[in-house]
């Protein structure tokens, strides 16, 4: 008994001492006791459950979502340090739902900054140190009941996303620590739990040393952003399972390598099912630790964004004849290659019609529901977006599942951005203190997402400079995963990126690169900035992309406006952006709203331009007089037999004929001439004739209904001819009867009067300041008719500071000189000489005789 008491005391002392350490300021400590990362899967009790794929229905699953006791403090040094004790009294604490973010529930304010850290208004960067003041801390407590039938099993806690870090305790004992806000943290709780009631407690800091690597251009929020749960495993289980599909040189037959890491020994039976559930291949491996096997598949259906066909691998772990657990894994057969300065998917140089997407919801912030994710993919499909970059961090696991299912190419980015440190000598890419964090974040991104066929590229991070830390990450990934390309924008065209993926390379620079001899494909990771009134020059980008083989597309910044749904003091709802919450936090104002769609997912006007330019069916003239057009199929894998065409003939804007082509057989990357049965006979030759052709789905698919228009084109059969002005029959006026009079006796104004009008010119600046016609005043009082060389700046103008660069053009009375010569008798010819300020002495209108 004395030994037990002593052991207990030592344990408590160790826990208390540990809790006083500063892991949140130590870049060498990014985790303590965190379970190794593995691919995203869930182990079910039997095959039927595995095929249904609903982990929430499994007896091995228990949610931690819902209400937690919650206590928030403004400053880190005010945080409670004993709240995790079992006998701690939390009756005065609030309730907060998990997942849920503090700032959206009344605890602190959101911060939006683009470049620079959220503390930039109060604290000078000094990595790894972060502020104590305004470093909010949230403490959580929850009592749970462990199911009785989990006895003898290993029990893990899964925290999907916690910003910016977390300390975890169970029943008063310290369990572990984790950083990296956008990847799950899992902990083995087996030795800390007891039968029946248990206390789980964790503490989260708004900022930690890891925040230096999370300086992304988005809302800075805190708390729990994704689902949290417990799951149970038998003592012997599959720790990890990786699938690597491949195709032969002809892109016909496939192989599937399955690599497993077994805890304990056992036999794993493998079978591959096609989309109809038919078994197409089997294998079996036996052993412990790391084992692998290859499966051959004859001519499998291939996965692409155009044809997202998925197979299902069923991995059954057995102990003798008894099933221990069953893991389902979705498999897509596709091959990624770099050849001749192009990225090939299944042998084809696909075009990436992409957008950058932040994980953001107007009501939940980082908490994005499955329904919202599906809505986002539906919008992408509606507007012909076929690729997404997970800017600038790993997304919810479900997002990749949905991209696999519905067909979206993914650039999977690691949670590394240190933009606020700049790109020079201070960049964290060159700082050895942060080498471990760079590596771990990239490793865990790959280890978790490896099985997703939608992931085409890995991205090392975003706007974080370049240096040895990224070089090491690139080398590790290329050794770990030889089936994908790796990109990083700051690597430029060096050997540490497979793709040249610049930001906002203009037309000239893009074309110069395409004409050069660098053997890397050009795919802009950000381009065509979609803020406000934008995309006016989008077609010009795609003229180049469609012209040069190694220019393979880009990702528009960005997909969705990031504003939050907020309310005024009077309860009126509005979309809030940076600066709306308080006057003291740093803010980059509305620069967070750069989306193709609004926060509620309604398309912004410029989205329609994107949808058109991104379409993959194009019509060009062939013999329009006889109704013949060329139809080009820009798809790489899909025939047009799943679409039909509708056409309409317009005469001066009015529809006069319509028709349909039901059968379109146009192979990928091919052009075919088709006949449209319209006739121009009987239509006045004075009328403009236009031909509209739209392509629509025959059947519902990938979230789109039957009849949905995926592409539309307009051709001119007969152009509009403006009526000619008949100058031969102009009404003749007797100039002797309409000669105006000029009064120059006013000190300020030159007055010109006629029978039905009066015009006053200001002698100081030469501008028309009064104009009356038939007794009606045409200019408001004190108004002047002045030249205007200005328009309201757009958001993108202001982003480039053009409103200041070109401010001179906004000034009324900008330096202008012009001469007016009227065809009137010599004594009345007027030549105003107008100078911009400062005006020369005596400058005014003057009458001249010629």
Give short role names for the model-derived ranges:
Residues 284-299, 653-685:
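Intrinsically disordered, low-complexity Pro/Gly/Ser/Thr-rich segments with frequent PxxP/GP/PP motifs
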């Amino acid at each position: 008994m004395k030994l037990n008491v002593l052991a207990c005391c030592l344990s408590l002392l160790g826990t208390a001492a540990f809790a006083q350490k500063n892991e949140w300021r130590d870049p060498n400590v990014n985790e303590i006791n965190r379970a190794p990362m593995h691919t995203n899967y869930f182990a079910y009790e039997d095959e039927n459950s595995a095929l249904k794929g609903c982990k929430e229905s499994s007896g091995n699953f228990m949610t931690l979502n819902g209400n937690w006791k919650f206590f928030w403090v403004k400053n880190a040094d005010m945080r409670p340090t004993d709240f995790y004790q079992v006998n701690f009294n939390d009756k005065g604490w609030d309730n907060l739902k998990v997942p849920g973010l503090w700032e959206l529930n009344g605890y602190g304010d959101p911060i939006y900054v683009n470049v620079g850290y959220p503390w930039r208004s109060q604290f000078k960067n000094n990595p790894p140190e972060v502020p104590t003041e305004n470093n909010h801390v949230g403490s959580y407590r929850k009592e749970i009941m462990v199911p009785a039938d989990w006895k003898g099993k290993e029990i893990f806690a899964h925290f999907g996303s916690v910003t910016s870090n977390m300390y975890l305790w169970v029943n008063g004992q310290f369990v572990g620590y984790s950083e990296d806000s956008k990847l799950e943290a899992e902990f083995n709780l087996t030795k800390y739990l007891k039968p029946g009631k248990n206390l789980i407690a964790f503490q989260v800091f708004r900022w930690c040393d890891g925040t230096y690597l999370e300086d992304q251009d988005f809302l800075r929020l805190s708390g729990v952003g994704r689902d949290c749960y417990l799951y149970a495993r038998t003592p012997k289980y599959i720790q990890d399972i990786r699938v690597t599909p491949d195709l032969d040189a002809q892109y016909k037959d496939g192989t599937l390598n399955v690599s497993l890491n077994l805890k304990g020994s056992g036999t794993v039976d493998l079978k591959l099912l096609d989309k109809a559930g038919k078994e197409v291949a089997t294998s079996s491996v036996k052993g412990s630790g790391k084992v692998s096997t290859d499966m051959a598949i004859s001519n499998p259906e291939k996965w692409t964004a155009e044809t997202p066909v998925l197979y299902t691998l069923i991995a059954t772990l057995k102990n003798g004849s008894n099933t221990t657990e069953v893991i389902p894994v979705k498999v897509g057969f596709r091959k990624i290659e770099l050849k001749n300065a192009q990225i090939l998917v299944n042998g084809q140089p696909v075009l990436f019609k992409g957008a950058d997407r932040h994980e953001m919801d107007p009501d939940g912030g980082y908490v994005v529901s499955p329904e919202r994710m599906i809505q986002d993919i539906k919008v992408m499909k509606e507007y012909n977006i076929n690729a997404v970059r997970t800017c600038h961090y790993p997304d919810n696991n479900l997002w990749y599942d949905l991209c696999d299912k519905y067909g979206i190419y993914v650039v999977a980015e690691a949670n590394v951005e240190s933009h606020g440190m700049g790109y020079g000598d201070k960049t964290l890419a060159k700082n050895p203190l942060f080498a471990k964090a760079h590596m771990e974040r990239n490793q865990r991104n790959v280890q978790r997402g490896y099985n997703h066929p939608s992931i085409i590229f890995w991205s090392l991070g975003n706007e974080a400079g370049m240096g040895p830390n990224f070089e090491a990450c690139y080398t590790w990934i290329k050794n770990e995963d030889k089936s994908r390309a790796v990109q990083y924008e700051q690597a430029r065209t060096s050997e540490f990126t497979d793709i040249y993926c610049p930001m906002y390379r203009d037309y000239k620079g893009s074309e110069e690169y395409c004409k050069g001899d660098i053997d890397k494909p050009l795919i802009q990771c950000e381009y065509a900035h979609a803020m406000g009134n934008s995309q006016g020059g989008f077609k010009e980008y795609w003229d180049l992309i469609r012209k040069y083989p190694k220019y393979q597309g880009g990702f528009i910044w960005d997909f969705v406006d990031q504003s939050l749904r907020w309310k005024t003091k009077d309860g009126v709802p509005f979309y809030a952006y940076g600066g709306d919450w308080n006057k003291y936090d740093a803010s980059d104002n509305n620069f967070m709203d750069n989306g193709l769609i609004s926060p509620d997912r309604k398309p912004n006007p410029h989205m329609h331009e994107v949808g058109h330019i991104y379409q993959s069916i194009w019509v060009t003239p062939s013999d329009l007089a006889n109704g013949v057009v060329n139809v080009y199929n820009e798809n790489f894998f899909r025939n047009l037999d799943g679409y039909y065409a509708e056409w309409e003939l317009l005469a001066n804007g009015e529809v006069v004929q319509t028709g349909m082509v039901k059968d379109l057989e146009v192979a990928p990357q091919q052009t075919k001439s088709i006949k449209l049965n319209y006739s121009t006979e009987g239509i006045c030759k004075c009328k403009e004739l236009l031909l509209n052709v739209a392509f629509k789905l025959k059947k519902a698919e990938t979230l789109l209904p039957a009849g949905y228009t995926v592409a539309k084109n307009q051709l001119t059969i007969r152009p509009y001819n403006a009526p000619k002005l008949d100058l031969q029959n102009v009404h003749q006026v007797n100039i002797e009867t309409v000669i105006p009079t000029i009064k120059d006796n006013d000190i300020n104004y030159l007055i010109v009067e006629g029978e039905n009008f009066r015009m006053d010119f200001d002698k100081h600046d030469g501008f028309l300041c009064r104009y009356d016609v038939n007794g009606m005043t045409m200019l408001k009082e004190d108004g002047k008719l002045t030249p205007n060389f200005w328009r309201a700046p757009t958001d993108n103008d202001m982003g480039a500071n053009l409103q200041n660069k070109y401010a001179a053009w906004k000034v009324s009375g900008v330096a202008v000189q012009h001469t007016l010569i009227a065809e009137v008798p010599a004594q009345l010819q007027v030549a105003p000489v107008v100078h911009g300020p400062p005006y020369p002495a005596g400058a005014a209108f003057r009458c001249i005789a010629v």
